[in-house]
């Protein structure tokens, strides 16, 4: 039997019980603040953050385009109060459509849309890019010859574009019992904490953000939440509020039992996630979500230390008009550099950012430009310093920020290197194996560690060791889909097709959009002579991924006589 390999890409599904959503409607989460903070509410409601997501029909960007590589024509349109994305390939008389539910992205730089299939949430394969005024394929799929229709909507993306993000149903990554998020855009509470009871308790609440750094100061003694003022928090907790979404790093490792969307203002971000960078990994173009990293490399930040943060230059409640930007940001520069400096330093040029923070092509977001927060002197005569915090043997992986270096555990480094091994970084799998073995000795009941070590062992051809590790994972977490599918591959290779099918069926029932798993089931039943069952699995694959070539080909072969069990 020809297996459609599934080992190599690992995701860790939500296994905790989901919290029920309040409504199938996206609510306006900041309106409750408007009665007391009307001017701030008015200005903030016009910002990019406030409009980062919402219902698909709100501010709908319609249009169409032809993808030359796949030969597919896409169209986004509204009909009878419903928003649709249609697709068709005239050469095959192949066509279909998906109803769009939500948008992601304010439209300032771009926008994508989300749609649901049987409760699973996916991202459209096309994006709108405002700076070039055109539709294009989603990043990484520009050369795709098939429609990538089964792209799961990632929690991290939704977390940084919405508020009130709900946990997915246990055993899945992108299936929700109701609305995936309760509020469109970034609401007041995302930066200021829960506002429930704020009006009644504020007079009796203790001062928020005391210098003690104790998280308990964020909440009143009565149990009601008091509002967090980020500027008054200790520097690490202040910066964490922005860093949650404006820092990407090379690798991010969730802490045990924690997820980034659970983070609350005033808490330590390192309690939820640990970031790593490859030292010296400084591209000439700024990464779309790594403004914090770029700023840390600047002379301004290194000399100012904790006194300088995002709020030193940015007003989170308002955005200056286009004609006011130069003067606005110049005033921020002069807060430190002073008018006397300005009279001597190119007095004829009033836009500091044009030279020192220019817009450059973005590395991670196609067809867009981003502001270079490295605040460099052009032409640059000195190389920027490399980040050196805590290195690892064999490769320059370091913790970020520097204050978190002592908090990084063996588990953190192990999972970081395993992620790099997935990306086929040279030498990463060997370093990952070393760290993972050490981490498993320390925490032998951690299913994430065991699954990661299983992946590395399988990558190195150590199938017996990998099988033992996957079995341990599934005893601890029966909903671990990656361990189940990869163990299924090993069982099939050893001749235990019945055991493989049982493992694959469990995983495919939970995540039916994973085409490779469904195809393996179809092939297994085809080989066993159960072609009717095989057809059902192929049809299930095509429900989520209708342009999947191997699926369409196997579907055709299953209708031939004699039947061919090959994709």
Language-model-detected regions and their locations in the chain:
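Primarily the internal scaffold of c-type cytochrome electron-transfer domains
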Residues: 15-16, 24, 31, 39-106, ...
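Structural marker of alpha-solenoid helical repeat scaffolds
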Residues: 442, 476, 509-511, 544
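Helix-start (N-cap) detector for alpha-helical repeat units in TPR-like alpha-solenoids
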Residues: 446-448, 481-482, 514-516, 549-550
């Amino acid at each position: 039997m020809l297996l459609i390999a599934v080992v190599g890409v690992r995701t860790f599904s939500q296994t905790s019980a989901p919290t029920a959503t309040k409504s199938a409607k996206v609510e306006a989460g900041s309106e409750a603040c408007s009665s007391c903070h009307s001017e701030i509410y008015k200005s903030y409601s016009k910002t990019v953050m406030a409009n980062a997501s919402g219902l698909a029909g709100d501010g709908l960007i319609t249009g169409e385009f032809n993808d030359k590589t796949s030969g597919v024509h896409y169209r986004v349109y509204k009909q009878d109060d419903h928003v649709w994305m249609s697709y068709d390939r005239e050469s095959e008389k192949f066509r279909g459509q998906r109803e769009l539910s939500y948008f992601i992205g304010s439209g300032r730089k771009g926008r994508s849309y989300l749609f649901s299939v049987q409760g699973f949430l996916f991202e459209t394969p096309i994006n709108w890019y405002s700076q070039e005024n055109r539709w294009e394929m989603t990043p990484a799929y520009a050369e795709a010859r098939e429609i990538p229709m089964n792209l799961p909507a990632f929690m991290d993306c939704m977390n940084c574009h919405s508020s009130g993000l709900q946990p997915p149903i246990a055993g899945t990554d992108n299936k929700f019992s109701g609305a995936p998020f309760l509020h469109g855009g970034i609401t007041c509470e995302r930066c200021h904490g829960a506002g429930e009871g704020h009006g009644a308790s504020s007079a009796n609440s203790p001062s928020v953000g005391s210098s003690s750094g104790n998280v308990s100061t964020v909440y009143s003694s009565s149990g009601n939440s008091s509002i967090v003022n980020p500027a008054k928090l200790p520097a690490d907790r202040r910066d964490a509020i922005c860093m949650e979404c404006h820092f990407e790093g090379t690798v991010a490792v969730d802490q045990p039992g924690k997820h980034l969307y659970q983070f609350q203002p005033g808490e330590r971000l390192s309690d939820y996630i640990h970031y790593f960078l490859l030292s010296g990994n400084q591209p000439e173009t700024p990464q779309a979500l790594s403004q914090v990293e770029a700023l840390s490399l600047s002379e301004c930040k290194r000399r100012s230390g904790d006194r300088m943060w995002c709020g030193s230059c940015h007003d989170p409640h308002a955005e200056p008009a286009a004609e006011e930007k130069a003067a606005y940001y110049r005033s921020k520069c002069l807060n430190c550099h002073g008018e006397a400096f300005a009279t001597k330093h190119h007095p004829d040029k009033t836009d500091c950012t044009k030279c020192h923070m220019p817009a450059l092509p973005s590395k991670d977001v196609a067809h867009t430009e981003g502001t270079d927060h490295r605040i460099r002197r052009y032409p640059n005569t000195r190389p920027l310093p490399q980040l050196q915090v805590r290195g690892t043997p064999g490769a320059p992986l370091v913790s970020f920020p520097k204050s978190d270096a002592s908090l990084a555990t063996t588990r953190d480094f192990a999972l970081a290197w395993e992620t790099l091994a997935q990306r086929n970084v040279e030498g990463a799998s060997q370093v990952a194996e070393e760290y993972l073995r050490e981490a498993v000795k320390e925490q032998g009941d951690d299913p994430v560690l065991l699954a990661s070590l299983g992946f590395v062992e399988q990558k190195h051809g150590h199938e017996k060791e990998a099988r033992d590790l996957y079995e341990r994972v599934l005893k601890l977490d029966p909903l671990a889909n990656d361990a189940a599918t990869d163990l299924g591959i090993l069982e099939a290779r050893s001749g235990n097709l019945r055991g493989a099918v049982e493992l694959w069926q469990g995983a495919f029932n939970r995540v039916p959009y994973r085409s490779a798993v469904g195809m393996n089931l179809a092939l297994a039943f085809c080989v066993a002579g159960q072609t009717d069952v095989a057809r059902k699995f192929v049809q299930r694959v095509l429900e989520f991924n209708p342009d999947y070539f191997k699926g369409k080909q196997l579907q055709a072969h299953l209708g031939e006589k004699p039947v061919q069990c090959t994709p």
